[in-house]
Amino acid sequence: MARMRVMVRERIDGVRPDTLWFLSHPPVYTVGKRTPPEHRPLAGLGIPVHETNRGGLLTYHAPGQLVGYVMCHIGAMNAVVPFLRLLEARLVDTVEALGIPAERRDTPPGSVELTGVWTRRTNRKIASIGLRCTRKVTSHGFALNVDCDMRPWTWATPCGMPEVEMTSVQRELTDAGHAVPSMAEVREIAAEMLGARNAPHPPAPNLSSGDLGTGTRAGRT
């Protein structure tokens, strides 16, 4: 988180271009600012719970999950929701490029937010999104389940939805009888769909044209 905060400050100060940082975390639950206590995992599971300042509720990170932190200057604070919808669309493109029919969903009035990416064939959630915006620069980002251990998802309430079934690229493709790509292959497809490549400082993303902006991949750790 400290490194992400440095990147955000650099983007605010104009010394860093829009950046997509791929990484993975050791097993950890992270909770957004509005996560109720009853959605947290029971004590004694051996998996830490980390408080964050992002939007969204509880999510789980682990090896085998592709996490992408997105530090983008979006031009205006009221562009956060359009940017989030654009990010969802690019992740849908990523999942479909892997051979899994996918979709984003609109949230009905009064419902828990359905932000993220869902599988159309099996009605499961495969990617989660949680963003924060500081002085027109986004932080945090998304998590795409590739081949991680899915059991810890059942030990808490993911995304505020007790009934949701989480899934992974591995599960969906294996169940359909297809080969499972490596993490490196998934990473390259995600980078392509998100428009991440080494580039000079870009303009703010053109939300009306569906452009996330020309980003730089900050590497993977």
Curated annotation (Swiss-Prot):
List the protein's name. Octanoyltransferase
GO CC terms, sorted = cytoplasm
Source species, domain of life: Bacteria
Site Lowers pKa of active site Cys: give positions: K125
**Localisation per UniProt entry:** Cytoplasm
**Task performed by this protein:** Catalyzes the transfer of endogenously produced octanoic acid from octanoyl-acyl-carrier-protein onto the lipoyl domains of lipoate-dependent enzymes. Lipoyl-ACP can also act as a substrate although octanoyl-ACP is likely to be the physiological substrate.
Catalytic activity as recorded in UniProt: octanoyl-[ACP] + L-lysyl-[protein] = N(6)-octanoyl-L-lysyl-[protein] + holo-[ACP] + H(+)
Annotated SUPFAM superfamilies? Class II aaRS and biotin synthetases
Pathway named in the protein's UniProt entry: Protein modification; protein lipoylation via endogenous pathway; protein N(6)-(lipoyl)lysine from octanoyl-[acyl-carrier-protein]: step 1/2
Any remaining note in the record? In the reaction, the free carboxyl group of octanoic acid is attached via an amide linkage to the epsilon-amino group of a specific lysine residue of lipoyl domains of lipoate-dependent enzymes.
Q: Which GO terms describe its molecular function?
A: lipoyl(octanoyl) transferase activity
Q: Which GO terms describe its biological process?
A: protein modification process
Top-level EC class = transferase
Q: Where is the active site?
A: C159
InterPro entries xrefs:
aa-tRNA-synth_II/BPL/LPL, BPL_LPL_catalytic, Octanoyltransferase, Octanoyltransferase_CS
Q: Where is this region: Disordered?
A: 197-221
Keywords from the named record: Acyltransferase, Cytoplasm, Transferase
Q: Which organism is it from?
A: Frankia casuarinae (strain DSM 45818 / CECT 9043 / HFP020203 / CcI3)
| Family as reported in the entry's similarity comment | Belongs to the LipB family.
Q: Where are the transmembrane segments?
A: none
Lineage at the top is: Bacteria, Bacillati, Actinomycetota, Actinomycetes, Frankiales
Looking up NCBIfam families in the UniProt record yields: lipB (TIGR00214)
Could you say which residues form the signal peptide? Answer: none
| Record has Cytoplasm as a keyword | yes
Tell me, in one coarse class, where this protein mainly resides. Answer: cytoplasm
